[in-house]
Amino acid sequence: MYPSPVRHPGLNLNPQNYVPGPPQYSDFASYHHVPGINNDPHHGQPAAAWGSPYTPAKEDWHSYGTAAASAATNPGQFGFSPPDFNPMQPHAGSGLLPPAISSSVPQLSPNAQRRTPYEWMRRSIPSTSSSGKTRTKDKYRVVYTDHQRLELEKEFHYSRYITIRRKAELAAALGLTERQVKIWFQNRRAKERKVNKKKLQQQSQPTSTTTPTPPAVGTPGPMGTLCSGSAPSLVSSSPLTIKEEFMP
C-alpha cells in the first residue's frame, strides 16, 4: 500500500478485497492537490487520476466513511483538507454532542429545582395543620358504634378469650375486621384487670382503719371519774425549784 497522511497506521487494507463506494461529496473530483507535501508520487497527480478504483485517496475516503458521514451532518463547521483530517476529531470537540444530550441540558434550570420542594411544602402544610390527629391514629384507631359495642360485650361476658372461628363470624356480622375484634378483646381484658385491681385496693383499706383509737387525755371516763392517764399530768410529784435573781 502507498503511504498517505490520511491513513491511520493501524489499518491494513488489501486492494484485492476493496470495493469502491459512492463519493461522499459532489465536488470531490474538482479538488486540487498540493504537490510536494511528502515524497508520495501520487500527491502530484491531477484530480482526474483519482477516479481509478485503487487510488489511495478513494481508499482513504472509503475506510473513513463513518467519520466522513458524521462530519457531513454539520458541513458548516468543518473545512476539509487531507493533511489536517483526523479520524479522532469528532470525539475531541464538545460541539459534536448528540442532539438528545445537548437538548436536555437547558431543561435542568435552578429555578425548577427550587420550585418543586417549595410547592411540595406548601401542599403539605394545610394537610397537617387541618387535622389534629396523626396518620397512625387515623389508621388504627376505630370508633365503635353502640350496636357493635353491645354485641362485643355480650360475646365478652360469654367468653373472655374469643376463638378464631367466632372472631371471623363476629367480624363479618358487625362489619369489622378480625384484627379490630381481636384488639377490642385485648383492651377489654386489660380494662377488666384494672377494675379488679382497683376493687381489691378498696377492700383492703377499710380493714386497716377499724383498729380502736386510745381516748384523749383529760376526757371524763365512766361514773364521772378521770382517766388514769390524766392523773400524772395534773398532780406533779417532783418539787419545783425557784431561782431568785437579784439585780445589782
Swiss-Prot record:
SMART domains: HOX
Residues annotated as signal peptide: none
DNA-binding region(s), residue ranges: 137-196
Protein location: Nucleus
Gene3D superfamilies for this protein: Homeodomain-like
GO molecular function: DNA-binding transcription factor activity; DNA-binding transcription factor activity, RNA polymerase II-specific; RNA polymerase II transcription regulatory region sequence-specific DNA binding
GO BP annotations, alphabetical order: anterior/posterior axis specification; cell differentiation; digestive tract development; embryonic pattern specification; regulation of transcription by RNA polymerase II
A Pfam family this chain is assigned to: Homeodomain
Keywords on record: Developmental protein, DNA-binding, Homeobox, Nucleus
Statement: the UniProt record of this protein carries the keyword Nucleus: yes
Amino acid composition bias (Low complexity), ranges on this chain: 201-211, 228-240
Disordered: annotated segments: 192-248
InterPro entries linked to this entry: Caudal_activation_dom, Caudal_homeobox, HD, HD_metazoa, Homeobox_CS, Homeodomain-like_sf, HTH_motif
Residues in coiled coil: none
Assigned GO CC terms: nucleus
Similarity field: Belongs to the Caudal homeobox family.
Name of the molecule in the record: Homeobox protein CHOX-CAD
